[in-house]
């Protein structure tokens, strides 16, 4: 099913934030910060994998992802969709179905037996591959998958994360010659004090003391 509607970016970001709060995927713990895949400790964590358990939300988020890519990257820019082990795999399958494209998945490392493959599926050399992850902070884990696809002969100029922390990683993607697309950032989930009131905003403010805002205000991370 090819997605052909193009909602406003701000609307998509606001709705994804609302969905994440609705399914209780936004977590805060200043006393015991969460360790992210990037290795950094964060008082805030978002569990995008929970999106998979809610069919209406899952379908809507995939519509948003398809809209974002078609509008910002183009209609004929990809030959296949790659999901990174493990969270990116189901989202890659869903997005590939939306865009009518083949799907592959990339292991964190070769499996160590059989063909010792790191990439599973059919990816002809020279294929233009979009790498998808559920979320990214500094881009480290996504670039492990991007590097593996490139080493196998694929071309990766674009990546997409459903959720981007929006604090770190911009330079990493620029240096790696990858354009990162995303639907929402922490700026959407954690609105500014002057933003208009909504149920999401009120719940967010109730759960997010000043330490969260201080963390989100940091400029960047050295990868």
Curated annotation (Swiss-Prot):
The keyword Transport does not apply. SUPFAM superfamilies: PRTase-like. Its cofactor is Mg(2+). Pfam families: Pribosyltran. NCBIfam families: PRK00455.1-3, pyrE. GO terms for biological process: 'de novo' UMP biosynthetic process; pyrimidine nucleobase biosynthetic process. One of its GO terms (molecular function) is magnesium ion binding. Belongs to the purine/pyrimidine phosphoribosyltransferase family. PyrE subfamily. Homodimer. Pathway: Pyrimidine metabolism; UMP biosynthesis via de novo pathway; UMP from orotate: step 1/2. This is Orotate phosphoribosyltransferase. Residues 192-212 are annotated as: Disordered. Its EC number is 2.4.2.10. Catalyzes the transfer of a ribosyl phosphate group from 5-phosphoribose 1-diphosphate to orotate, leading to the formation of orotidine monophosphate (OMP). Orotate binds at residue 137. Optimum pH is 10. 5-phospho-alpha-D-ribose 1-diphosphate binds at residues 107-108, 111, 113, 133-141. Keywords: Glycosyltransferase, Magnesium, Pyrimidine biosynthesis, Transferase. Residues 192-211 have a biased composition (Low complexity). The keyword Magnesium applies. InterPro entries: OPRT (IPR023031), Or_phspho_trans_dom (IPR004467), PRibTrfase_dom (IPR000836), PRTase-like (IPR029057). It catalyses: orotidine 5'-phosphate + diphosphate = orotate + 5-phospho-alpha-D-ribose 1-diphosphate.
């Amino acid at each position: 099913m090819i997605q052909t509607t193009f909602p406003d970016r701000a609307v998509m970001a606001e709705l994804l934030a609302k969905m994440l709060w609705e399914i209780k995927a936004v977590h805060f713990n200043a006393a015991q910060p969460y360790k992210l895949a990037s290795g950094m400790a964060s008082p805030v964590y978002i569990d995008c994998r929970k999106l998979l358990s809610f069919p209406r939300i899952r379908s809507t988020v995939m519509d948003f992802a398809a809209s974002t890519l078609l509008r910002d990257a183009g209609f004929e820019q990809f030959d296949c969709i790659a999901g990174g082990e493990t969270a990116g795999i189901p989202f890659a399958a869903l997005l590939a179905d939306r865009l009518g494209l083949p799907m592959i998945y990339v292991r964190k490392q070769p499996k160590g037996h059989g063909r010792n493959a790191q990439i599973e599926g059919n990816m002809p050399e020279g294929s233009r591959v979009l790498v998808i992850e559920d979320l990214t902070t500094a881009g480290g884990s996504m670039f492990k998958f991007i590097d593996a696809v490139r080493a196998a002969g694929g071309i990766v100029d674009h990546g997409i994360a459903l959720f981007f922390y929006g604090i770190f990683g911009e330079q990493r993607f620029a240096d790696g010659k990858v354009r990162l697309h995303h639907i929402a950032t922490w700026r959407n989930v954690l609105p500014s004090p002057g933003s208009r009131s909504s149920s999401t905003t009120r719940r967010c403010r109730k759960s997010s003391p000043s330490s969260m805002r201080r963390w989100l205000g940091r400029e960047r991370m050295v990868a």
